Regions:
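N-terminal Rossmann/SDR dinucleotide-binding element
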Residues: 2-72
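NAD(P)H-binding glycine-rich loop region in Rossmannoid oxidoreductase-like domains
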Residues: 57-95
Length: 125
């Protein structure tokens, strides 16, 4: 880690909301670790205090990743596409639940006490 400031982990940090969150965390001086497959987001923030892991949340292994344990986790990685959710509602809901459970497990692995989970409009399909 490049700073003495706490590390904040953000899933979906390349999406619209996630990238704005990353910018705000950087403005406050935090080091930010982003896990995002970058399929639906294109808001990649080039900054010396951001470390990117380009992968699906379900394929990220916190045991093998060389990241500083985060002091907080913001989980924003969910299926954002309404059209796809309407076509494949079970797959969408299953994916959103599975990714949230996986990231909650990261909080346990990292002994992280602050875990914030959000969702997308696809939860209402």
């Amino acid at each position: 880690m490049l700073t003495d400031m706490p590390n904040i982990l953000v899933t979906g940090g390349c999406g619209f909301i996630g990238s704005h969150l990353v910018e705000k965390l950087l403005d406050q001086g935090f080091f930010v670790t982003v896990v995002d497959d970058n399929r639906s987001g294109s808001h990649y923030i080039e900054h010396e205090m951001v470390e990117y892991h380009k992968c699906d949340v379900m394929h990220f292994n916190p045991h093998h990743a060389s990241i500083e344990p985060p002091s907080a986790i913001f989980h924003l990685a969910n299926s954002p596409r309404i059209r796809r959710a309407l076509e494949f509602p079970t797959e969408t809901i299953t994916n959103n639940i599975a990714t949230t459970c996986a990231v909650a497990d990261w909080a346990r692995i990292f002994n992280c006490k602050l875990f914030f989970a959000t969702s997308s409009s696809t939860q209402y399909v």
